Amino acid sequence: MTIKFASLILAGLGLGSGALGSVTFRREESSWTNDSLTSVFAQQAKGLFLPRTVISFQGQEWFENVTERWDIYAPPTFKVSVSPSTEKDVESAVKLAAKFKIPFLATGGRHGYGTTLGKLKNGLSIDLSLLNQFSIDSKAATITVGPGVRFRDIFTPLYEAGFQVPTGTCSCVGMIGATLGGGIGRLNGLDGLMIDALESARVVTADGRTLTVSEKENKDLFWGMRGAGQNFGVVVSATYKLKPLYAAGVWTNVDLIFSPDKNATYFDVVTSMEVPPQLTIASVVTYNATLDEPQLIATLTWTGPRDEALAAMKPILDVGPRHSEVTEATYATLPRVATFGTTDAVCAPGQIYDIYGVGLRRLDSAAWRSTFSKMARFYAAEPAGRASSILYETWPVQATVAVPDDATAYPWRDASTYVLIQMRWDRPGSPLERAADRLGAELRSDLSATGGYQGAGPAVYVNYAHGDERLEDIYGARKLPRLAKLKKQYDPGNVFRFHHALPTKYP
């Protein structure tokens, strides 16, 4: 049986993931004026696209909706947007941009971040939100999604069909965009990374061809797409292998708030725990405006019933939270109830997030306690920065490390915690920006120093990268020679370069 869905979005706001592919040509990004780009599309696009494909310009409502981003720190800027309604129209948009040497970024949901995206100025947006169809094939146990599909679109249909698939935790993120960097989340211990579920994809490459990549077709490119995919093309569809619901789709969510004096004990417990595949721990250093003090929020999830969950979580519960909420959920409802049901607030677009990330193989309680203390001092000194936070995602790794390291381009399979440092302030151009950015980089360095990876820099999940990292920090030195060869083969002109670009030669 095949179940098909198509929730057509006419004015998408905060639609999901980061850039699926970015292409630039031999003209300087800033050399295009509004009039020249408008002229190209007014004259050349006639009859090129199907009627449902939308061309929009700066100042128009559609344009503003489909170029609005979740993070407005160092964002790309655009003069024109094309919203293709078919795969063929994606190809046409790429070819038109190539012909006139127009730099562009293809986006599935605009949830991506990183300062390298901001190098695109006054370019073309290829908005993929209309390609939001997906189909579940129950017999084959697969789901095929378009680049406009977000995580929240698939949870209920999959649950009702009796399946699950690895996803991230933020429900508004685009599925394909998150996959290309690796795809971490709550099912990493049971089912592995999102790239481990990826069965095949259709990719528009730098020369305008659409290729199918899988273990049987274009296998070399398929390897590179799984961990560094933003460097090789625009993904117009992807098929994932599904697993039957674990524990009949029953989940238990426990949200906790700890007072600041508990941070040392809490971190001691979390960093010393053996995390079974059913358990996930998300720890957030944040600020409590009501009590005027820093605090720790923990979201613990368990794939199974309440009694099992509370037994597995007992070491953390024994630390003594000042507030707790236990919710019995399902695979479909968990993303909406987790972290006190704050998913809508977290997904609100148009906010400043200066993000630094680091992956940890070794968990050092002293380093974590130090980051709490530094954030507490920052909160006290900079009231305008109190929306800043540190998120520690401690995911189980059993299924992730069961996949051989050389099976995909992803370099950090044995990372047991991913840290997302989110420095925030109230408005662009704030004098707080320099101090906040400096602290973000410092915290990343502190955690990297005890994180268990060898090398001169941090081990950084590409989807959490800031933009100042070395290539080795993001892609891993052992992966780069093969990735560089693929880059030379499929994109020798380095046209896909706005998302932590790969070289065509390494070393």
Swiss-Prot record:
Transmembrane regions listed in the UniProt entry: none
- List residues of the FAD-binding PCMH-type domain: 73-245
Catalytic activity line of the entry: dihydropyriculol + A = pyriculol + AH2; dihydropyriculariol + A = pyriculariol + AH2
InterPro entries this protein is in?
Answer: BBE, FAD-bd_PCMH, FAD-bd_PCMH-like_sf, FAD-bd_PCMH_sub2, FAD-linked_Oxidoreductase, Oxid_FAD_bind_N
Q: Which domain of life does the protein's organism represent?
A: Eukaryota
Q: In which pathway does it act?
A: Polyketide biosynthesis
**What EC numbers are recorded for this enzyme?**
1.-.-.-
The protein's induction, as recorded, is: Expression is increased in rice-extract medium (REM) and is correlated with the production of pyriculol.
Signal sequence interval, chain numbering = 1-21
A single Gene Ontology molecular function, please?
oxidoreductase activity
Which residues are sugar-modified?
Answer: N34, N65, N263, N288
Q: Does the keyword Heme apply?
A: no
Cofactors per UniProt? FAD
Keyword field: FAD, Flavoprotein, Glycoprotein, Oxidoreductase, Signal
The effect of disrupting this gene, in the record's words, is: Impairs the production of pyriculol and pyriculariol, but accumulates their reduced forms dihydropyriculol and dihydropyriculariol.
Functional description taken from the UniProt entry: FAD-linked oxidoreductase; part of the gene cluster that mediates the biosynthesis of pyriculol and pyriculariol, two heptaketides that induce lesion formation upon application on rice leaves but are dispensable for pathogenicity. The highly reducing polyketide synthase synthesizes the heptaketide backbone of pyriculol and pyriculariol. Pyriculol and pyriculariol contain several hydroxyl moieties and double bonds, so it can be assumed that several reduction steps occur during biosynthesis.
Family to which the UniProt record says this protein belongs = Belongs to the oxygen-dependent FAD-linked oxidoreductase family.
Q: What is this protein called?
A: FAD-linked oxidoreductase OXR1
- The scientific name of the source species is Pyricularia oryzae (strain 70-15 / ATCC MYA-4617 / FGSC 8958) (Rice blast fungus)
| Gene assigned in the entry | OXR1
